[in-house]
Amino acid sequence: SLGVQDFPFRAYFYHTRYSKTEHPLTQHSEATFTSVANVPIFYQKWLPDGPVRGVVMIVHGLGEHGGRYGNLVERLLPEGYAVYAIDHQGFGRSGGQRGHVNHFHDYAKDVHRLNGLVRAEQPGQPVAVFGHSMGGLITLDYAQTYPKDADCWVVQAPAVRAEMSALLVFALRLVNLVRPTFSMERPGDGVISRDPEEVRRFEEDPLFVPISTARWLVQILTAQKRVKASVAATSGPLLMLQGTADNVVIPAATQEFFERIPAADRTLLTYDGYYHELHNDIGKEKPLSDIIGWLNARMVE
């Protein structure tokens, strides 16, 4: 399997390319811990200039990494939030075979491990988890399993349903039985943003992982079924955000899942005409402001 050493990171200014914050680099640090699969998990940390008023953990989506959330990070820091962003196993600067996982729930277990580090470094601080796309599914799985790990949850464009033909699913399950680590390039992941500059940066990102293994594809289908079956365990406060023109996940699936969540404090915000990555789309100021306002009302005020 490929490890973190197989990628040319030294020549790549990872934390400055995506984090456009003007805060001093002394407030940014990088570290690793060992995952439940015994591979190194890379994460980044940003601290505000002033006192910490809360913590936001970022859980990234498929193929990407925790360094692509600079637009969100630069809005959180002035509000007094410390930010921790993980790279899941098999993605970004973490170890493991690219695009592979033995059990999808391992992602949630790794976020739980990072949460332990966060709690030790920021004792007594309220914690929120922000998950996008596949990271939204991971966050829902995490919230259902470890509801006490966070004080509130933000889920953007969660991958709660996949559109696959029965024949394709059968073929994937067959390949998974014979050769689970077989890698295949995914068909187009859809257009993430209406901003051509964001699309260009995404497509040129040397850390982007365009492949998934048969095991991974079977595991995400299993996880989607499990998370939907356990929807009653989804705790609040919870904020969901969805662009109506998203062509990566299914907007109607987000609505359907949200309506089944029993939490009293739950909010669904939709953005007309927005694509998949609300935080990187044209007009991103609106969803970013909504996220900040929602967090402040529950974690600070």
Residue ranges with predicted function:
Residues 272-301:
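Catalytic active-site module of serine/aspartate enzymes centered on a nucleophile-bearing elbow/loop
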Residues 23-48:
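N-terminal cap/lid segment of alpha/beta-hydrolase-fold proteins
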Residues 73-96:
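Conserved alpha/beta-hydrolase
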Residues 63-65, 92-122:
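Catalytic nucleophile-loop/oxyanion-hole region of alpha/beta-hydrolase
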Residues 122-132:
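Alpha/beta-hydrolase fold nucleophile elbow
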Residues 234, 240-242, 246:
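Short beta-strand/loop motif that positions the catalytic acidic residue
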